């Protein structure tokens, strides 16, 4: 069984998993500033409790807490010999303790003084490289390897650097080790388990993904006949199971006990996870291929896109020509039948998810385009013939506006929001990693663990399309596409034309109803208790058009709210994604995304937000109401949030007494210029305003920047009001 990795962004929450190992490991000894003679270390020793050399105890404690001054004083005074700085029975050196506690400066100093980087110590006879890698300390591992540490050395259990790195579940370290190219990805331990076996057993999707990208063998078996899929089934992590199945794991392969993955899942109560993974890979619960009714996924998407055109026409007809009860019944039956057909016969051909997220299908885009289709239909065949003589300018305006809407919608559906192609050149990727290590920024905030590129500022990786998007704004299900640097301006023009088109069409529709009223044969029949005479004429003589107008006005409300949000964010020089992050930051709420970072303290830049993260609580972030899906789809959640911020109602928490400025806000005038003007100053002004940016270059604070290589923001002057 094999297939292409296609994980829906919203359904896969791998980014929610925190595998940070920034906290140092310490022994039993309290890490006091001054270690007295009575202190002792016993945490990682094979020796029993016994009196120890107080000088060695003090030295090891200093190595643990990174006290470089004390270590230097003891070595330079001759009290400690760095080439024999261990207890004879334990064999745990100062380099072991410094490595295990992420003390980079101390590690460098000890190596410079002649410490053996390959010395084995402790009950597992492990090297400093093993100690550092088990904690995920990539900077220490890099330093040790640069100074001659052997990655192929194994400890007493037979684990090499790749195995111990896998145990840490620190994906930044795993990626680094793989790109060194010094260890075969399928190197086994004494029981025949590879790193992929261990990662699968741990339920570590990020490590599994990295190993599979390096062509780790999914069919290799250990001494018990277990494949990585067998061990993944024991753990039951659905995303790990899915990745292994997609890369060719055989669900029917049996281990030495004669059990396949299906049997193990039943014994370990992980059947649901395995069945979900099988389904998302195109197989039923028994492991056999699901029938797909469309060989070409694009054909299935087209059916999904055009289905709302028909459904919308039927629903409007039901309400126009049947009683309210029959109309509601007809609508329910139509929607249920359409949903059943799409879910069972259409969706499986292009998206396989147990819980289909309609946002990730062209369905909502079909609703929007279907609405436009029926609007054009009633305008062309009903309103235009009846009103052109009296309202020729208004009719031409409606035609021009909706011609623009159709053109821009077609363009948006096919547009590139600013994708960055994932890196494939291993030498280039390796150089990027080394550079980030050099500057202390090798973490998932600056390096994409999925596409292996250095992440520019304002960019974001989206798993649904397996790409990083420049100046990412948001995902819009109504155009079935992401909004980013290259199509953001088109999107705003689109919603602006929609707003104007709805207003013009509503006015023309009222003129049309007025014509119906004037030409009515029996004007006494126009009796409506709550409607005006014009609307009453529409209800009496053309209810289809009246209900379509009502539907369009409802749509117009959220489009108007979306327009307000977009223009507000343009004024503030911020994207929707950045604005949401800024609000969470000011509320003191921890986001779902975690930065995988094991940089030593001496390399970490001061970031007050990281300190505040320790005090934050998810609190209100986890609260959701019954209409959350609806408000998210229509954008009203962002509208209400923007209204609150514009009125100065940004909440503050006990742990967050100040408001942080928006880093990309250079003043509303400059922000508007940066957004609306392309960076090509030689082009005519109308082209700079109307056309979207070409390539990856744009304006920021009036300066031309390459958004694909934007690693530092232009300087920004902070006003007194922002400081107070």
Swiss-Prot record:
Pfam families: Ank_2, DHHC. GO terms for biological process: negative regulation of pheromone-dependent signal transduction involved in conjugation with cellular fusion; protein targeting to membrane; regulation of endocytosis. Residues 330-331, 382-392, 511-543 are lumenal. It is an enzyme of class 2 (transferase). Residues 446-496 form the DHHC domain. InterPro entries: Ankyrin_rpt, Ankyrin_rpt-contain_sf, Palmitoyltrfase_DHHC. Residues 1-308, 353-360, 414-489, 565-724 are cytoplasmic. It catalyses: L-cysteinyl-[protein] + hexadecanoyl-CoA = S-hexadecanoyl-L-cysteinyl-[protein] + CoA. Its EC number is 2.3.1.225. ANK repeats lie at residues 54-84, 90-119, 124-153, 157-187, 191-220, 224-253. Gene3D superfamilies: Ankyrin repeat-containing domain. It comes from the Eukaryota. It is found in: Early endosome membrane; Golgi apparatus membrane. The chain crosses the membrane at residues 309-329, 332-352, 361-381, 393-413, 490-510, 544-564. It is a multi-pass membrane protein. One of its GO terms (cellular component) is early endosome membrane. One of its GO terms (molecular function) is protein-cysteine S-palmitoyltransferase activity. The active site is at residue 476. Palmitoyltransferase specific for casein kinase 1. The DHHC domain is required for palmitoyltransferase activity. PANTHER family: ANK_REP_REGION DOMAIN-CONTAINING PROTEIN-RELATED, PALMITOYLTRANSFERASE HIP14. Belongs to the DHHC palmitoyltransferase family. AKR/ZDHHC17 subfamily. This is Palmitoyltransferase AKR1. The gene is AKR1.
